[in-house]
Amino acid sequence: MPALADENIFAYSYGSETLPKGASEAYVWITDRRDKNLGEYNAQDYQLEVEHGLDDNFQGSLYLTFQSNHIKGLSPELGDIDRNFAFNGANGSLKWALSSPYTSPIGVAVYLEPGFARYNAKSGERQTKLFLESKLLLQKNFMDDKLVLVGNITAEQEFEHEGGGEWESELELEGSTGLAYNIAPGLHLGGELRYTAAYENFPNEFHRSDYALFAGPAVHYTTRRWWATLSYQQQVAGGPDVRSRNLNLADYTRQEVRLKLGYNF
């Protein structure tokens, strides 16, 4: 069974396909992030999403996000946090498919997602964040659509402040790729590679303040209406934190696990 329109074969990387006009999809994301260089750190990100095909090559989505944080001894400047499933924010997105990998040499889509968040994803501290995420999505299918290769380039401009402080700006750049093979009807096995970096005080400055590289396996299973995707990501390189032997465990975690469950209707 080849990949279906807008099927989430990967947990972090997106394909270029959209839902058909009038089709809808509901799904939940659960991401578990653990292990930093100091103290105890585990955080869970939750996302509830409804997606709808507005046209055969254009879709829209609405999201609600929630967050749990259990942090102790992370930094002398930060207090301990014990938070369970708190409302974090809301996002909306639009995705426009310019070409399909099933009818063209390569599938191309563009994606825009504005939103806001109430908690800092790295520290768990209370904040106000506004952001606009943009993506270029590429997809190439091989071997009668059984082998799927995707690539994403993402830029997210953020504006945030904590308490009564001044607004600060940051640019996050990410590049990711995923490769998966349809080994049996409805079952894809593959892996993902993801590079992410932050540029503080952008656009006034363009200087990379931190980065990390993650890699790991992904498995996807789909039926006529239900599907599930599970991915494990291990940090394999990072900087500029020199205390963790070429890993950046001050700004990012050592490992992430993401589960996505979806229903088509």
List each model region and its residues:
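Transmembrane beta-barrel domains of Gram-negative outer membranes and organellar outer membranes
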Residues: 4-263
